[in-house]
Amino acid sequence: MEILLLTRDDCAFCHDAEEILDRLSTEYGVSVRTLDVDTPEGQQLAERGGVMFPPGIFVDGRPFSYGRPSERKLRRELEKHLGRVGKT
Protein backbone atom coordinates (compact mmCIF):
# COMPACT_ATOMS: atom_id res chain seq x y z
CA MET A 1 0.00 0.00 0.00
CA GLU A 2 1.23 3.48 -0.84
CA ILE A 3 0.11 6.85 0.41
CA LEU A 4 0.87 9.85 -1.75
CA LEU A 5 1.00 13.28 -0.14
CA LEU A 6 0.69 16.32 -2.39
CA THR A 7 2.33 19.18 -0.55
CA ARG A 8 3.72 22.69 -0.87
CA ASP A 9 6.53 24.37 1.10
CA ASP A 10 4.42 27.26 2.39
CA CYS A 11 1.52 25.06 3.53
CA ALA A 12 1.03 24.75 7.31
CA PHE A 13 -1.45 21.86 7.02
CA CYS A 14 1.08 20.04 4.83
CA HIS A 15 3.50 19.94 7.74
CA ASP A 16 0.72 18.54 9.95
CA ALA A 17 -0.02 15.90 7.30
CA GLU A 18 3.66 14.93 7.11
CA GLU A 19 3.80 14.41 10.88
CA ILE A 20 0.62 12.31 10.86
CA LEU A 21 1.82 10.21 7.94
CA ASP A 22 5.24 9.67 9.56
CA ARG A 23 3.49 8.18 12.60
CA LEU A 24 1.04 6.08 10.61
CA SER A 25 3.65 4.78 8.17
CA THR A 26 5.64 3.42 11.10
CA GLU A 27 2.59 2.03 12.87
CA TYR A 28 0.99 0.41 9.81
CA GLY A 29 4.08 -0.29 7.73
CA VAL A 30 2.86 1.63 4.70
CA SER A 31 4.93 3.53 2.18
CA VAL A 32 4.54 7.32 1.96
CA ARG A 33 5.66 9.33 -1.05
CA THR A 34 5.66 13.13 -1.01
CA LEU A 35 5.22 15.16 -4.17
CA ASP A 36 5.15 18.94 -4.62
CA VAL A 37 1.75 19.95 -5.97
CA ASP A 38 3.39 22.63 -8.13
CA THR A 39 5.29 20.12 -10.28
CA PRO A 40 3.69 18.99 -13.56
CA GLU A 41 3.03 15.52 -12.08
CA GLY A 42 1.62 17.05 -8.89
CA GLN A 43 -0.68 19.38 -10.84
CA GLN A 44 -1.93 16.50 -12.97
CA LEU A 45 -2.68 14.32 -9.93
CA ALA A 46 -4.36 17.20 -8.09
CA GLU A 47 -6.61 17.91 -11.06
CA ARG A 48 -7.45 14.25 -11.59
CA GLY A 49 -8.18 13.70 -7.89
CA GLY A 50 -10.15 16.89 -7.30
CA VAL A 51 -7.57 18.30 -4.89
CA MET A 52 -8.50 21.98 -4.62
CA PHE A 53 -5.55 22.90 -2.35
CA PRO A 54 -2.79 21.06 -0.48
CA PRO A 55 -2.26 18.86 1.28
CA GLY A 56 -3.83 16.19 -0.88
CA ILE A 57 -3.73 12.58 0.25
CA PHE A 58 -4.12 9.59 -2.06
CA VAL A 59 -4.36 6.02 -0.75
CA ASP A 60 -3.30 3.40 -3.30
CA GLY A 61 -3.81 5.88 -6.13
CA ARG A 62 -7.30 6.92 -5.05
CA PRO A 63 -8.06 10.41 -3.73
CA PHE A 64 -8.70 10.34 0.02
CA SER A 65 -8.74 13.97 1.18
CA TYR A 66 -7.43 17.46 0.73
CA GLY A 67 -6.95 20.32 3.15
CA ARG A 68 -6.54 19.85 6.88
CA PRO A 69 -5.91 16.13 7.48
CA SER A 70 -7.86 14.02 9.98
CA GLU A 71 -5.65 11.41 11.63
CA ARG A 72 -8.69 9.49 12.87
CA LYS A 73 -10.24 9.23 9.38
CA LEU A 74 -6.93 8.30 7.80
CA ARG A 75 -6.32 5.66 10.47
CA ARG A 76 -9.76 4.13 9.76
CA GLU A 77 -9.04 4.11 6.03
CA LEU A 78 -5.72 2.33 6.55
CA GLU A 79 -7.32 -0.24 8.83
CA LYS A 80 -10.02 -0.87 6.23
CA HIS A 81 -7.44 -1.33 3.46
CA LEU A 82 -5.27 -3.57 5.61
CA GLY A 83 -8.20 -5.71 6.74
CA ARG A 84 -7.92 -4.79 10.41
CA VAL A 85 -11.44 -3.44 10.91
CA GLY A 86 -13.47 -5.55 13.32
CA LYS A 87 -10.64 -7.99 14.03
CA THR A 88 -9.31 -8.68 17.49
Where on the chain are the PLM-derived regions?
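Local sequence-structure signature of Cys/Sec-based thiol-disulfide redox active-site neighborhoods
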Residues: 1-24
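Short, structurally constrained coil/turn elements
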Residues: 26-28
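Structural micro-motif
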Residues: 48-58
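Non-catalytic, surface beta->alpha helical segment in thiol-disulfide oxidoreductase systems
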Residues: 59-87
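Thiol-based oxidoreductase modules, predominantly thioredoxin-like and allied folds used
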Residues: 30-42
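Generic recognition of short, well-ordered alpha-helical segments
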Residues: 15-19, 44, 69
